[in-house]
Amino acid sequence: MTPEQKARKIIDEKLLTSGWTIQDVKRLNPNAAVGVAVREFPTDTGPVDYALFVNGTPVGVIEAKKSEEGENITTVEGQSSRYANSTFKWIKCDYKIRFAYESTDKLTRFTDYNDEKYRSRTVFSFHRPETLASLIRRNDTIRNNMKHFPEFDGTGFRDCQITAIKTLDKSLAENKPRALVQMATGAGKTFTAITAAYRMLKFGKMNRILFLVDTKSLGEQAEREFLAYRPNDDNRSFSEIYGVRRLKSSYIPSDVQVCISTIQRMYSILSGEETDESIDEISLEEVTSMEKKSPKEVVYNEKYPPEFFDCIIVDECHRSIYNVWNQVLEIMDDDGYVSCYCKR
């Protein structure tokens, strides 16, 4: 098997795992499933490695490359763009190729051409067809929404909280989705994080945020603060506007907007393990020993794919426990990743 054949074999496996039906162009039937990936689909500039159809309409392309090209895979983004702007053979309906992937057997990058100043990012796997269909139905992308947040009303907030929130808004608007918020102990870190979550849900139009903690007590504290929070622009409490749930089992409800979980529970959920509340109880001694342990790996979970959460907020991100369960963060294809910790 050549390196390119090996890469395509693994790409096929990832597509199947992500809910796609794969077809050879000779057996073309783009309406066979919600999502159909067609190999070597002809365009007026040559055949694209994979054409992605959602509900019978072409919406994306995949450029498959051998593993050796992984480190330089961004250099083939021009190829993807060329195919995205090409004319697809046999297609009679109006269509737009909005999504592009470049993939090897080890690395996959993704671009949404509807993003302002779009750029590719690494993703754990391909998005599910239903996810792409949902993105197409939206009025705008989350990343575009985050560029146009209204001015923050800091009435009742401390200066350090106002600075943190405004700086975070600026970071997100500049297409920098990963941010670190460092605040002094007692400065209202969780309150600030909840304010950021509220703004991302209301103005960023996010569907779901994951609030990660490393102990049960921090999760309970965060839950209390979410339930009690009242924004300046609404008389209702946070929980009256958005659903909030602290996870206590292996089930994640899809109808809540904020899920609070320990990172060890989230690892178990993604790994398909049954859990109870005891998994959230980690002693100080265990936390201290985390640095000596090998990082834990997670695999694709069909029920909770990488795009399940639009943002991850990590509480006390400096702690050793995140070194061990770091792949829980890496697997998620999130539009925002906010780390918070107190400087003691």
What feature does the model see in each segment?
Residues 262, 315-316:
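Walker B catalytic acidic pair
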Residues 214, 316, 341-342:
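Conserved H-loop
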Residues 86, 298-305, 319-337:
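Short, conserved "post-DEAD/DEAH" coupling segment immediately C-terminal to helicase motif II
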Residues 216, 238-249, 263-268:
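Conserved helicase motor
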Residues 1-208, 217-233, 254-258, 264, ...:
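ATP-dependent helicase/translocase motor core
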Residues 85-87, 91-92, 97-98, 238-242, ...:
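Phosphate/diphosphate-binding loops
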Residues 196, 246-247, 323-325:
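Short beta-alpha junctions and helix-cap segments that line functional grooves
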Residues 157, 211, 314:
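Conserved SAM-binding loop
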